[in-house]
Each structure stands twice: as structure tokens, then as C-alpha cells.
Amino acid sequence: MCLLDSCTALLLLGCWMSGSAVRISDVTLVNPDPVVSPLTAPSLLCVSSDWSSGGSVLALGQEFPRPQGSVLALGQEFPHTEPRPHPAAATVTWSSRSHAFGAFYCQIRNSTGRKIYTYKMLQEAAFLPESLTITVNQGENINISYSRRLYSPEDTVIHKNGHFEHSSPKEDISDIIHYPVTNAKAESHAGIYAIRYISAAPSSAAITRLIVRSCRAGFWGPNCTESCPRCANGGVCDDTTGECVCPPGFRGHTCDIVCGEGRFGAGCKERCVDGVCRALVFCLRDPYGCSCASGWRGLSCNDACPDGYYGAGCTQKCVCAKGRCDRFRGCVCAGRHGSRCEEADSSPVISHLRDVEINTGVELSVNCSASGRPAPLHGDITLITANRTTIAAVDTHTLNDQSTSVFRVQQVRVSSAGRWRCQVNNTHMQVEDEFTVEVKVPPRPQNPPVLQGSGPRHLLLLLNTEPYSGDGPIATTTLLYRPASAHTWSSVTAHGPLVRLDNLYPMTQYLTQVQLSRPGPGGAGQAGPAATFSTQVLELPVGVKLSAVSQTALLLSWDIAPAEQHCTYEVSCLQAGAPGTLRTFQLPSNSSAMHLSDLKPRHKYQCTVRSSCGVGQNHPSASAWTLSDQLPPPPANISIWNISDTSAVLTWAVAEGESVSRAVIRFQQVEQAQYRQQVELPVQTQQLHMRFQLLGLRPNTGYQLQLWTVNNMGESAESPPVSLMTLPQQESSALFAAHGHLLLYAILGSAGMTCCTVLLAFCIVLQLKRNTLQRRIHSILREEPAVHFSSAPPPHRRSAVVSRSLVFPALQWSDIQFQDVLGEGNFGQVLKARIRKDGLRMDAAVKRMKDYASQDDHRDFAGELEVLCRLGPHKNIIHLLGACEHRGYLYLAIEFAPHGNLLDFLRKSRVLETDPAFAIAHRTASTLSSQQLLAFSADVARGMSYLSQKQFIHRDLAARNVLVGENFVAKIADFGLSRGQEVYVKKTMGRLPVRWMAIESLNYSVYTTNSDVWSYGVLLWEVVSLGGTPYCGMTCAELYEKLPLGFRLEKPLNCDDEVYELMQQCWREKPFERPSFSQILLSLGRMLEERKTYVNTTLYEKFTYAGIDCSAEEAG
């Protein structure tokens, strides 16, 4: 084992670029000193010819006389110097000769595959082998030969793989010792043979290895039945793979390609350091073994080949009809190549050169390809820059007669632009070809962004990107921003001239800059001039109320903050007059209420709500008493005033903090004690003084009054009686009493009876109408289509009826505050409302049916409620907030979409119609970018994919039925025509969206998910055309006639072919040939990632929008 104190250096290098792993066939183990001299430090070098072998590195180990692989596999990287002699290599150098003896190997690190072996002996060995390795075929006879260097009167012993094999008496030993092996077999004869004198140390032995192919000569394979190729120039057929293992200096399928002097490796890309390869032993994978480089021979490869011989170990004889014999190449003839001049030369031809556009400061990678006979070698192809600097290739790959060299230039500058040359040099000629390198400067805006609007939590900025310096086109626009007091920048990618920054801090200054990017790596330019803008002040919490819940609890509530106000709340509460009872609570931004518990009964508490955004402002507060734990006291300070002949005013005081909810007055005539009248009056929470006017009293009559109060614990004791004496009858009163008492009683009696009758009739009608509506909803929800085609269980197996299993979130009528009408049709209406749900206030869109809506309209409306309940939440489907029934009408509250429906949103983006000056100034036909339009389409596809997975059919998919919510997310809405089956056949004809309907729906009233895909294709056309009317100018009758004949919507002028191809796939006549929504989503996702302009919104000459025909849309 190579210990740390015996190794001066153990270095490992790997090429860390992406690529395939190193193969053992690409590895060469170089042994510079098989016989170790005391004068030199022994070493080994393992080289891989695969320079693109990312992550896989080489490891060296020892196998004989002791397996010591783990330490030799350790190492560190070479220092990165240019040029490196071998881009992927491992080397080891010993400081002690005693450890540099035995059999060593090289393999791929962490691999259990094949190894490449070499051997080292000490110079004091008494014998030397004829060669380090001997390769024979199965069944052949061979002599393992050694030469004696030192004489000793002792017997010799031969060990094989460390075990005794043979010994010779001293009398039989000559200067050349032969150990014969007959009928060689791999399993019994292959191995390491070491010879020494019997008394000598094992480390003084001479080593050679016998490699026995498992097949007879000329064959390979598991059964040795496959014929080997004719391996030329000393190549050996691999008995496992059938490949020719080529000697160093040759390559090709049959080793017929000559590399020349000083080259080695699988592709002849490696060069010896001195260019000569003298005194180096090259070892390859079995069954080749070890040999000298081409042109050299001997155990240490120090001897040149004699005349007439060439190749590795000088084993090949020149047979040259013409020309001369070169010991490195074989026969050398003018105009021909090959070891026997069997191939005619052809001039190299450079191909695949392309002009290059690159951004300044990035690395340029250029491939130069040249073909010829013989194919150019690594180093034959060079790159010459525009300023005549020559650059060497970092790697070369050769396939057949074509070689491709890879060049890399760090940090290209503008001065490097111009005509570059790819040059090929060989022994006979030089050819070159030119290409253009354009170096672009990334763009930088010249003006800062401009503020267009602001709020407490947002800024709306005009990017102001033109004019800019540098080169276009502009690929992406990024807005950089940070608080003025911070150091870290945030960024958002812009998809139009305006950018809205949300979730900002109120009353904060923000530093903003615009950064432009052009296509390609390094295309991001420097940020433009900075501008500082401030967000606005947030409004304080409003509607703060504190109310009693129990004797020990209060409820504090306030109106929920606007959507963009995300500040937290701090609530401080204390008992009145007791500062030591202060309690503080921290609440999140979506809070609008909190319960206070563990309080004292009959105590007053004060609470203040502070907003984290309203620093330095006065904050609202409220106070309330907890409910009482005892009966209330009777009213106090009772007084009577403003007495007349028929009336009087009664005032009294209510005790504070006693939770009094009602006050009761009982009064009677003094002379008629059996007739008593009683009045109950509600007491407001903070009301301490009360007033009541007694009317209809008798003149000149005495009355006795008593009062008491009621709270959560019960009634108080009665107050002491209070006397009242009315004044004598006035003259006008007497006259009226004499002549009008009877008439008054008749009028009052008749009016009372009439009111009672009307009230009773109204209650009966209301109850009947409510029962009728409930029965209608239940019957609608239970109604099933006439024909089903579904993989789900048949209808009679369904558990109960739909209406009984339907559970929807209920809203209270008192929790809905209507604000405005958002839209209405012939039979329905949508209103904007503010609702309270789960203690929180939020915006909502509330839908209701009009009085004269038909049975079908009510069925579709109730069906929409059922579909939304069964679908559940999804980010691309409008969310159901709740439902409410009031006076026999059903109200449906859904998520409020601030940007309206997609169709109107697209048409509003037609800026050439709404703001021509802006359109011309910014050369755009729409405020929406290609990315935004594709994002809308992807959102709808994602929602429809979820809908189809739930086995629901929409039946009315169109841009008008898609809403644009917060952050411009598209959400599918209007499920009034949806059904929960895979196939639905409509049994009646109603209003039909003909322009969006599939052929099978028009002809046979069949609706499936595939028909929804057709409708999606039309929706995609609407998005690309910015809200155009499908088949504008055509009637529905013409559509019925032309669609079955193959007529389809024309491609919009601003539409990419790939997007229109997706539309056409959706409009295929056979439903099963149309793509699924998941496939559509996959295609759109890929388009979004590529950031290509699939929908061109640039304003070009004679630009026209797709036509809009509202009357045609209403007709279908």
C-alpha cells in the first residue's frame, strides 16, 4: 500500500464538463520506467482520451504482491494550467523505490469493471523479462523468456500469481531462460510469472504477465464462434467484444489509420510531452497488454526500430511497392496513406461553419469540422480570430473521415468581431474557411421609469424603455426595485409597457430601475437610471365595535381592510380605571374580529385597534361592559312632566353596567285597579336615560305607574309606585269626544281588521311561494338527462337524489350588502356586494334570476350551484362563497373578479382603438403581451383539465364565460349548462352557443369532454384575435352547412403556426382524435418556457383587428 510518507505526490484530474462517462477503451496506462533505477523517482500516468467525461475520474491501484487499491485511489486535482498535457489523467509518483514494485492497475473510479495493468521491477533484479506482457490465443504454445543479468550459484524459482510454479537447478541455468507453456488455456495458464534466485528477496524478481485469449485465433464471443475483424498494424481482437484493440499510434475500426510519431490514445488525441514517446511503455485493456509506442522497441522502449520495421514494438514489417518505410507510420508514399500506402489521399474539406452572434463578455464556443483522407488529427485544425490570434482546440472528435475540433474563447469583446478563420494543416496542404462573429452589446434604457399610479401597497409604473443604448432586439424587460433603506433588490419580469408592484410597504420610498435583455447568454444589460417613488398612507381600521358575549367575554370587531392592505393589527384592551389590567394581542392582516375571555362580570373594558401601517396616527377605540352576574336594580330618578289631559312624558335613569336590555312600564287607573296596561321598551347598549310618552289617557283621571328593568339574569324589583293626574278635558277634546268617539272607534276597528287580513294573506302567499321554489330547485337538481353514456355507475345505483346529498355554504341575508350592478341579461342579474363570511368581510359577485325567468333558466341556475359545490376549490375555477334564499329567490355568491370577463378584457386591450396615440408611440396593438395571452390560455386549459378529471362537461366554454381575477389569473365560470357525465345528449333545444359548438353537438346534440376541447379551440382563437367574433359575417345556418365540409376558422394574422396547429387539432372532425386538456396544457407550458413570441402584438403597417359582431354573438 502506498502510504502517505512514501508518496510525494498523488494527483488526480478529471474533466468536469457534461458528457458521457469514461470508458475503459479510452484509457491508456503509461509506465515511464518499468525497470526502476535508483536515480529516478518511479511514477505512473493513466490517461483518458474522452475529454468530455464529466464527473468520472480515474483511479490507480496495486494488485501484486499485495492488493492496495484504496490509498492509490486517493488524490487531489492538478492545478489548472494552460495548456494541460492531458485534460483527463491520474498520476502517482513514489518517493521510495521499495514500494514501486509489483503489478499496478488503472480503472474508472468507483467502478467494478475491467482494469488496465502494468508492471515495475527494481534495477537490482537478477533477471529481466523479454517483455512486460505476452498475448497468445487459446491452444497455442509459447515460451516465457527471461535474460540473466547477474550470476549467482543458486537455483531459480518461478512463481505464478504468488504461488510456486517451477524451479530450475543452478546447473541448468543459462543466460536465456525459457519456460514453455503448451496448449495455453486462460483459466490455467494466464497470470503473473515472477522469476528470482531462490534465496533472493521477492522484490528482486523479474515480472512478466501471460494473457491468454479465451478463443482460438480469429474468433471471439461467449462460444468463440464469431469471426474477428482483420486487425491491422499489430492490433489484437478483443475476445469479449470483437473490437480491435489498436496499438499506440494507430486507430480506426481495424487499426488501419496511422496517427504518426508521438501520438497515442483511442483517437490519437494524446501527445507525448517531448513528441517522441521514447522510453515509455503503453498498456491497454486486455487482451492487448503492454507495448512500446510506434517506432520503438525493447523492455524499456529505448531502441528504435531497425530498417524495414515499424509499429508498436517494431513487430510490423514494411511491404512497400513504392515510397519508403517510416518506423512510425509504415510505408510513406506521395499522395497516399495507410501502412502499405493502400489508400489515396483526399484534400480536407471544411464544413458546417456558421456565422455566430454573441453577447460581449461571455465565452464563445466554436466547432470546426473538416473531412478528408486521412481524417485530420487533433491539433491539425486551428482557429484564427479576426485580430489574427491563433487558438488551439480543446478537444477533437473523429467519426469516419470527419474530425470536429472544439474551440473556446473566454470573454469575447466587441473588438473581437469580424471575419474568423477555421484552418486545417496536414503534411501536404493547408485549407481554411471563414465565418463572421458578431459581438453585440446588451441594451440599457436611457430614461428612468415613470409613475402612473400608487396606493398604500402598490405602485403602477410605466417602464419607459425607449430609447435605449446597445443592441436589440429586446427579449425580456425586468423591473428592479427595493426599499430605499434596503440593500437587496427584487425583480419582476414585465409583459407590457406597464408593471404593477404589489405587496409593498405603505408610506415607504422605493428605488426602481429597468433592466433590458437581448437574446442569448449574457444578454442582460446594465440597469438604467434609477427613480424613487413612495407608496401612500393606509387607512385606519373602521367600524370598530365592542359587544358583550357573556359575563366573562366580549367580542371586538372591525371592518376588514381593503384587499391591498396587508398590515397586521395590535389590539390593546384594559379594564376601565385599572391600568394594570392592560392586555395586548397581535393579529394577522386578514383579521376582522377577536374574542376577549377571562374577564370580570359587570365591568367596563376599553379596546384600541392599531394598524402596523398607520404609525403616528390616532387609532380608533371602543368600550363595553361584560354581562351582569346579578339582577338589575329598578329604574331610578323617575319623573313625570309635560302632563296634558290625554298624555304625559315619563323619564327615568338606567343603572350603568347592569346589562339592562328592556324596561317595563305598567300603569293603571287608580279607580279601576283591575285594568292594567303594560309596555316593554328595548334599551340600547350605552343608553342610560330613557323617555316614554304615555298617550290615550283619560282627562282628569288619576293613574298609578310602576317600572322595572330586565337583564340577562332576570327582572329587577318594581320601583315604588308613581302617581299621575291628568288635566281636565280641554274644549277641543270635549267636542271631539262628544261627536267623534263612535266614528273614531269604527275607523280604528275597520283599519285594524284590514291590516290583519292583509298581513295574514301576505304570510300565506310568501310561505306558498317559498315552498314552490324549494320544490322547483329540488326537482331541477334531481332531473337527469334523457340519455347517458358514462363509465360511471348507472343512474339507478346513485345514492339518494342529488339535492339531498348537496351541501353548500350558507349565507345570511343580513350579511349581504349590495353595492352595484355588474351586468345583467334577459333572465339573470349579477350584482357586486360586500358579504360577511366566517367573521370576515369580502367582495363578492352575487347572481340572481329575474322574476320572468323560465323553468330551464331556473334549472341551469340551480345546476350551477350543484356543479360549483361538487367541483371543490381550484385556482382556475371561480370559487363559490355561499348561497342564500330570501323571499323565495335563490342568491348565489361567487368570488369577485376585479378585471371582469376575459372577452371584455381582451377587447379593452385593443389599444389602437382606445388610445391610438399610446399604440403608435409604443408600436403595440395591445396592452397584453404574448406571454400574458398564452398564460390566459394555459389557465383555462388547466381548469378544464381539472373539470374533465371530475367528469364534468362545461358545454358553454367561451371567453365571455371566463373571468380574470387577482394577479390576472383566468378562472372558468358560468357552469349553468354543465353536466356531471362524460357524455350528455341534450333532450330539448334552447339557446345554443353555435359558434363555439362542436360538429357532433350541432348535428346530434351530443356533448362530451371532446366537444369542450372544440370549444376551447375557439376560445384560443378569441384570445389570439384579442376578442374577435368567431366566423364574423357568417350566419348560424351557414355554419351548419360548412363545418361538416371541413371549413374552419382562419388563422389570425398575428398568430404563430404552432398555436394555429393546436387550434386545428382541437377542431378535428372525429372527437377521439382531438387532444386532451392535459396535452393542451403541456403544449402551452412548453411555449411559455421557450419565451418565443407566439402571438405578435407589435403594431405593423396596415394592422387590423379581427372583426366583432355583437349581434352574431347574441344569436349564437
From Swiss-Prot:
Gene responsible for this protein: tek
Species for this entry: Danio rerio (Zebrafish)
Annotated Protein kinase domain residues: 816-1095
Protein name: Angiopoietin-1 receptor
PTM characteristics: Autophosphorylated on tyrosine residues in response to ligand binding. Autophosphorylation occurs in trans, i.e. one subunit of the dimeric receptor phosphorylates tyrosine residues on the other subunit. Autophosphorylation occurs in a sequential manner, where Tyr-984 in the kinase activation loop is phosphorylated first, followed by autophosphorylation at additional tyrosine residues. Phosphorylation is important for interaction with scaffold proteins and effectors.
Family: Belongs to the protein kinase superfamily. Tyr protein kinase family. Tie subfamily.
InterPro entries documented for this protein: EGF-like_dom, FN3_dom, FN3_sf, Ig-like_dom, Ig-like_dom_sf, Ig-like_fold, Ig_I-set, Ig_sub
EC number(s) stated in the UniProt entry for this protein: 2.7.10.1
Residues at which ATP binds: 822-830, 847
PROSITE patterns, sorted: EGF_1 (PS00022), EGF_2 (PS01186), EGF_3 (PS50026), FN3 (PS50853), IG_LIKE (PS50835), PROTEIN_KINASE_ATP (PS00107), PROTEIN_KINASE_DOM (PS50011), PROTEIN_KINASE_TYR (PS00109)
Membrane-topology annotation of the record: Single-pass type I membrane protein
Glycosylation sites recorded in the entry for this protein: 110, 143, 223, 367, 387, 425, 590, 637, 642
Location(s), subcellular: Cell membrane; Cell junction; Cell junction, Focal adhesion; Cytoplasm, Cytoskeleton
Stretches assigned to the Ig-like C2-type domain: 46-126, 348-438
Pfam families hit by this protein: fn3 (PF00041), I-set (PF07679), Ig_Tie2_1 (PF10430), PK_Tyr_Ser-Thr (PF07714)
Lineage: Eukaryota, Metazoa, Chordata, Craniata, Vertebrata
GO molecular function: ATP binding; transmembrane receptor protein tyrosine kinase activity
Record text on activity regulation: Angiopoietin binding leads to receptor dimerization and activation by autophosphorylation at Tyr-984 on the kinase activation loop.
